[in-house]
């Protein structure tokens, strides 16, 4: 492979954002057009003010050309993000389930279509708070007895972005823990 070894274990955040752009969103077109056939599918018809479902990449492209207004996902509202944050803080044992590609889609929409979102500054702040709470849980999980004694870390409900950030560290740490394990324990397992 042409990539350096440091990039083999995980995808980059940009690659994850690229993958997220294949998820579908709703747009309100500002133009009229019949169906359009693309490699990824057939989209349309586009008639304002009716909403249409398109891949995120197409919605972003139309938004940059001022041809549509992006309808934010239902979870990208101040009320829902506050609920996610509250639930995340209350659940000290694990991670709350977040929508698929939560961080990647949020970032792209806030960067490109912030004028289509209500209270984008508040949304950024809430997303940052959610991310910080989850990162604190990851740090606490890495220091827990389960990791030190049983060689595992529960990562249920982590987002792909969080897993990619954590994976290189975990691979090195687990390898180091295996070398520190006493020899008699290794023989018992075989």
Curated annotation (Swiss-Prot):
Record-linked Gene3D superfamilies: 1.20.58.1020, 3.40.5.50
Biological process per Gene Ontology, one example term: chromosome segregation
SUPFAM superfamilies listed in its UniProt record: GINS helical bundle-like (SSF158573), PriA/YqbF domain (SSF160059)
Pfam families: PSF2_N (PF25005), Sld5 (PF05916)
InterPro entries documented for this protein: GINS_A (IPR021151), GINS_bundle-like_dom_sf (IPR036224), GINS_Psf2 (IPR007257), PSF2_N (IPR056784)
Organism superkingdom: Eukaryota
Keywords associated with the record: Chromosome partition, DNA replication, Nucleus
Keyword Nucleus: yes
Principal subcellular localization: nucleus
Localization (cell): Nucleus
GO CC entries: chromatin; CMG complex; GINS complex; nuclear replication fork
PANTHER family: DNA REPLICATION COMPLEX GINS PROTEIN PSF2
Function: The GINS complex plays an essential role in the initiation of DNA replication. Has a role in chromosome segregation.
Family classification: Belongs to the GINS2/PSF2 family.
Assembly mode: Component of the GINS complex which is a heterotetramer of SLD5, PSF1, PSF2 and PSF3.
Protein name, per record: DNA replication complex GINS protein PSF2
Lineage of the organism: Eukaryota, Fungi, Dikarya, Basidiomycota, Agaricomycotina
Gene, per the UniProt record: PSF2
């Amino acid at each position: 492979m042409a990539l350096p070894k440091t990039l083999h274990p995980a995808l980059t955040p940009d690659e994850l954002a690229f993958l997220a752009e294949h998820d579908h969103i709703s747009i309100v077109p500002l133009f009229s057009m019949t169906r359009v056939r693309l490699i990824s599918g057939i989209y349309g018809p586009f008639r304002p003010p009716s909403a249409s479902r398109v891949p995120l990449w197409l919605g972003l492209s139309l938004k940059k050309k001022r041809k549509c207004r992006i309808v934010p996902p239902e979870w990208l509202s101040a009320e829902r993000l506050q609920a996610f944050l509250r639930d995340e803080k209350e659940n000290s044992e694990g991670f709350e389930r977040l929508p698929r590609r939560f961080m990647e889609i949020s970032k792209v929409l806030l960067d490109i279509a912030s004028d289509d979102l209500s209270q984008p500054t508040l949304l950024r702040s809430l997303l940052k708070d959610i991310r910080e709470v989850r990162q604190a849980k990851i740090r606490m999980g890495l220091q827990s007895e389960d990791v030190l004694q049983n060689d595992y870390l529960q990562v249920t409900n982590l987002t792909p972005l969080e897993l990619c950030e954590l994976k290189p560290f975990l691979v090195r740490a687990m390898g180091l823990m295996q070398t520190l394990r006493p020899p008699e324990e290794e023989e018992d397992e075989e």
